[in-house]
Amino acid sequence: MIGQPQSPEYKLSPEETDALFRSLLHKEGTWVEWGVGCQQLQQSGHSAQEIFEQTGFQTAQQNMIIVAAQVYQSIASSGVPEDLLAYCRGPRSDVLYELRILSHSQRAIAAQVCQAKSLEFDGAKELARAMQEFARLPQIPDSFTEHPGDAVAYQAWRSAKQKKDLQDRTRLIAKGLKFAHSATARQKIEQLLSDLTTSPTKAAPLLPLYRYDEDTNVPLLIPVAGSLPLESDRLLSVPPLKQASPFNLVTVATATSLVPLPSWQNVLTAGDPVVIFHQTDQLPQPIPGKPEPVLILLDRQQTTWNDNSYFAVDADGKVELGWFAEAPIAKILGQVLLVMRPKKILDENNLREPWQMDD
């Protein structure tokens, strides 16, 4: 059983330290055990130089086998067959070291490809990089799959299409066929064999495919009733908008002004939202400073009074905003959900001079 690296808090006893130094000096066990031993000694406070003087393992070699042993442990924990583990111990520390840039789930299948294709460290390095680049693509290319072999085959196919030199193109085609895992990927590469003498054609670019990662990036369109002073009938007559999934499609049947708002929680909770505009010095609690316009979001569905909210009420046919300690006699037109000030720009001229903007 290959030993597990100890935690940084673990301290070797003098007897354990001597035993590890002696085992490494005589290179007992496999390279995996050497890597675990070097890591245990380093975690116990022994420098790489001291380990070199005691065992003959140079600093660079210590680093490689320590990292490779960690890769081996992650592969072993994936439940792979024993023959693959035996291949890794073969020794293949240089091969496993190149797989360090992959995730734990990728390392096991990458090691299987290394075993099946008899890859050396340079081939393993190319495989790992191809897998990383393939994973960054916005979508899986046509005819290829997520298998690591197809990832290398895709890189070879793409490079071969751009090569004019016949020898280079032939070499890349052979490489792609060697690694292609799926039948569709192999067919894609074999198509290049039918016309080796022609100039490479430019492949169609990938679609600019994106997906929203955060709900707050999706704006919500809210109908606008107007600015105060405003007739109550005007506020109530603005038709509500219906948004259709999955892209919040809005169909406006009448001439209605709209304003976009972020998908904040208090905006999303509105059952029948409408926007009005007002001035900071005319709010129920005036805001100090220079007067400026504000956007006020009302929910016309919320007409039940509570003493924790501000409301818009009908005052002789006009919209009036206020807070009420008790239920008002006037008709409640809607609850105030949001009062938003405009974005503050310190120096608008700076926006027109890119060289003055901060990095």
Swiss-Prot record:
Ranges where the record places region N-terminal alpha-helix: 12-195
UniProt-annotated stretches for the region C-terminal beta-sheet: 219-345
Main localization, broad class: cytoplasm
InterPro entries in UniProt: RAF1, Raf1_C, Raf1_cyn, Raf1_HTH, Raf1_N
Pfam families per record: Raf1_HTH, Raf1_N, RuBisCo_chap_C
Keyword GTP-binding (UniProt): no
Gene Ontology biological process terms in this record: carbon fixation; photosynthesis; ribulose bisphosphate carboxylase complex assembly
Subcellular location: Cytoplasm
Cellular component annotations (GO), alphabetically ordered: cytoplasm
KW ATP-binding (keyword) present: no
Keywords recorded for this protein, A-Z: Carbon dioxide fixation, Chaperone, Cytoplasm, Photosynthesis
Similarity field: Belongs to the RAF family.
Subunit structure: Homodimer. Forms an RbcL(8)-Raf1(8) complex. Forms complexes of many stoichiometries with RbcL with and without RbcS. RbcX and Raf1 can bind simultaneously to RbcL.
Domain observations: Has 3 domains, the N-terminal alpha-helical domain, an extended flexible linker and the C-terminal beta-sheet domain. The 2 C-terminal beta-sheet domains are swapped and pack against each other to form the dimer interface.
Job of this protein: A major RuBisCO chaperone. Acts after GroEL-GroES chaperonin to fold and/or assemble the large subunit of RuBisCO (ccbL, rbcL). Cooperates with RbcX in RbcL folding, plays the major role in assembly of dimers into RbcL(8)-Raf1(8) intermediate complexes. RbcS replaces Raf1, leading to holoenzyme formation.
Protein name: RuBisCO accumulation factor 1
Natural source organism: Picosynechococcus sp. (strain ATCC 27264 / PCC 7002 / PR-6)
Organism placement in taxonomy: Bacteria, Bacillati, Cyanobacteriota, Cyanophyceae, Oscillatoriophycideae
Gene: raf1
